[in-house]
Design a protein with these regions (language model features):
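Conserved P-loop NTPase motor cores
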Residues: 24-25, 34-62, 69-73, 89-166
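Detector for small/aliphatic-rich hydrophobic stretches
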Residues: 1, 5-9
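Active-site regions of enzymes building and remodeling cell-envelope glycoconjugates
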Residues: 77-92
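A domain-level signal for caspase-like cysteine endopeptidase catalytic cores
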Residues: 65, 76-77
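Intrinsically disordered, low-complexity eukaryotic regions enriched in glycine, serine
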Residues: 6, 13, 30, 67, ...
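Pre-Walker A adenine-sensing motif
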Residues: 11-31, 52
Length: 166
């Protein structure tokens, strides 16, 4: 495998045998609001670090909730996310509370706009990092399906990281 980098176009050409793949640098600052992102990569490949980079670029989002079974072992998110917003395992109640919050924010903002006031920022970022150990619990959960299909309408940005595909 060999590669070449074109600095002017921000692309990297990767040759693998007879195949050629052109990769373009992803600019996180241009990512749309309320995105749904799934990262699938092997252990130790930097998925959590990519999440951290996205969090940094989206630091203007006031609320972030993290579900990470490994957090109790490595405190990766604990250095910059308050403990009240970090969960060690998935529970559908987490999403219920997020949806309730978003509904309250929506109603409050509607009232604020009627009064001519500026709406509050209702965006939220949810990260489910390496939650494959509890996939039986969340994979068929209606709350997760709602998030995948309608998260953007709830103003929820969602990042799911996994070591292998479902």
């Amino acid at each position: 495998m060999n590669y070449s980098i074109d600095i002017a176009s921000n692309t990297k050409n990767v040759n693998y045998g007879a195949s050629r793949l052109q990769l373009k640098r992803f600019d996180v600052s241009k990512m749309v609001d309320h995105a749904t992102i799934a990262m699938i990569a092997k252990r130790g490949s930097g998925k959590s670090w990519v999440c951290r980079n996205i969090m940094y670029e989206k630091k203007d989002i006031a609320t972030c909730t993290v579900v990470s079974p490994t957090e109790k072992l490595n405190s990766f998110y604990g250095n910059f996310i308050p403990p009240a917003y970090i969960y060690n395992r998935y529970d559908s109640d987490i999403l219920s509370r997020i949806y309730s919050r978003q509904e309250r924010m929506f109603e409050d903002n509607k009232k604020r706009e009627e009064k001519g006031k500026k709406p509050k920022d209702d965006r939220i970022l949810l990260i489910m990092d390496d939650c494959m150990s509890s996939k039986g619990k969340w994979l068929k959960d209606d709350q997760i399906l709602e998030l995948f299909f309608n998260g953007r309408h709830h103003h929820v940005s969602f990042i799911l990281t996994m070591q292998f595909s479902l």
